[in-house]
Amino acid sequence: MNSKIFAVLLLLAFLSCVLSDQYCPKSSITACKKMNIRNDCCKDDDCTGGSWCCATPCGNFCKYPTDRPGGKRAAGGKSCKTGYVY
């Protein structure tokens, strides 16, 4: 009986980790001079190692997702270019 309860609890813990929502991390920067804005990415495919393309006031950067909401994913699109955008 105890082993069944343990197995169920272990399964629930595993599912909560796998099914938890992921977000771009919130940026600690609130503003950026236009001459310093650059995009390292425009879409998630531009990033490596499971990181996402996240938007910040200083441009788009590859960041690892977190379980805390607050950041935003880069919109990408045809107008997005990598490098300095000024």
Curated annotation (Swiss-Prot):
Q: Which GO terms describe its biological process?
A: defense response to bacterium
PTM per Swiss-Prot/TrEMBL = Contains 5 disulfide bonds.
Which tissue types show expression of this protein?
Answer: Expressed by the venom gland.
- Provide this UniProt record's keywords sorted from A to Z: Antibiotic, Antimicrobial, Disulfide bond, Secreted, Signal, Toxin
Q: Does the keyword Secreted apply?
A: yes
> Which GO MF terms are attached to this record?
toxin activity
The residue ranges crossing the membrane are: none
- Disulphide bond pairs: 24-54, 32-58, 41-53, 42-80, 47-62
- SUPFAM superfamilies recorded for this chain? Elafin-like (SSF57256)
Signal peptide positions on this chain: 1-20
Q: Main site of residence? A: secreted
Q: Which domain of life does this protein belong to?
A: Eukaryota
Compartments it resides in: Secreted
Annotated Gene Ontology cellular components are: extracellular region
What is this protein's function per UniProt?
A: Has antibacterial activity.
The UniProt family comment states: Belongs to the venom protein 11 family. 01 (wap-1) subfamily.
Protein name according to UniProt? U15-lycotoxin-Ls1d
Per the UniProt record, the source organism is: Lycosa singoriensis
